[in-house]
Amino acid sequence: MSEQDQELRNRQAQFAKELHGESVERSGLTALLGKNREAQQEAVAKYLRHWDGATDAEAEERRLADYNESTHSYYNVVTDFYEYGWGASFHFSRFYTGESFAMSMARHEHYLAHRAGITSGDLVLDVGCGVGGPAREIARFTGCRVVGLNNNDYQIMKGKHYSRKLGLGDQVSYVKGDFMNMDFPDATFDKVYAIEATCHAPSFEGVYGEIYRVLKPGGVFAVYEWVMTENYDETNPEHRRIAYDIELGDGIPKMYSVKVARDALAKVGFEILVDEDRADNDDPVPWYYPLTGEWAYIQTIADLGTFVRTSALGRRVTSAFVSLMETLRLAPRGSSEVVNALESAAAGLVAGGKSKLFTPMMLFVARKPETAE
């Protein structure tokens, strides 16, 4: 690791301690009560400095160049809101008739593990692991050992806390790192997976190349990728607005097309085994339903709490509540700006899903050749 990279990590770790304090043991909106106000304002400013509405090439280049710091700042300010609305697994899933939200999330993770061929005894890398919800679920489901890679110190602290609490401290571990420049030796892992995380990379070729490097020959990489579909037209202003809303609200420097992802996998050396948009289906309940506010899609009584928090109406209530907390100085300044950014994301995700311009679950399963050096 270069001296510059080490300095950045040390600075980020120190900032995370100053910002979050003891809030790692809290979850959801209650964690906002334990933040350092000045540090929170700084984190929000760091994230929003690249989001001024500009979508030209120069603005995109600035965001791509600052992906590490921007993504780190993004998750410093949104993690508590994600947990409040979504729980410990920060991803979407398909919904089957009669299936609860929690069941659908676990099934989505199990399906990826199954397609990757993860088994007991495997050493597996989770690229962009969040607070470790999928890592813990896949570890329990398969019996494998999972190493979660993350560039956000707060999420790593929370992941370790949850793993210890659930008795998985020896099976699921967490490492701070940049997925564009991993610290692992070549050919370390039996399997690698990523769930809606590598979209934060400045280039698919860069992150997929690192995954290829740390994977053993014959090993498998499985990913649910966020991409714009083949219906997307970069020159169409409405299409670009949808993509920008997703970028702004989800901390993504640039939304790429499915072709860019597919070509990147092949270019770095992978053999693509599965190439399937899991969102392109006739499911009666769409993957984006929790964001819509359409009560007819609710499948079980257990989903009411999640739906109230994540629906359009629920988000408006949350926005008003956070604004009140900020006014009363119970929540740090900048919290409302975070909620507004997440609202932009929700609008873009629903619009992208309904128009089939965007998918959060482009499934690629790819193998590193046995003969690879």
Swiss-Prot record:
Enzyme Commission number(s) of this protein: 2.1.1.41
Name of the molecule in the record: Sterol 24-C-methyltransferase
GO molecular function: identical protein binding; sterol 24-C-methyltransferase activity
Cysteine disulfide partners in this protein: none
GO cellular component: endoplasmic reticulum; lipid droplet
Gene designation: ERG6
Organism: Eremothecium gossypii (strain ATCC 10895 / CBS 109.51 / FGSC 9923 / NRRL Y-1056)
Pathways per UniProt: Steroid metabolism; ergosterol biosynthesis; ergosterol from zymosterol: step 1/5
Keyword terms of this UniProt record: Lipid biosynthesis, Lipid metabolism, Methyltransferase, S-adenosyl-L-methionine, Steroid biosynthesis, Steroid metabolism, Sterol biosynthesis, Sterol metabolism, Transferase
Annotated GO biological process: ergosterol biosynthetic process; methylation
InterPro entries in alphabetical order: Erg6_SMT_methyltransf, Methyltransf_11, MeTrfase_SMT, SAM-dependent_MTases_sf, Sterol_MeTrfase_C
Annotated catalysed reactions: zymosterol + S-adenosyl-L-methionine = fecosterol + S-adenosyl-L-homocysteine + H(+)
Protein's UniProt keywords contain Transferase: yes
Family: Belongs to the class I-like SAM-binding methyltransferase superfamily. Erg6/SMT family.
SUPFAM superfamilies (UniProt xref): S-adenosyl-L-methionine-dependent methyltransferases
Domain of life of the source: Eukaryota
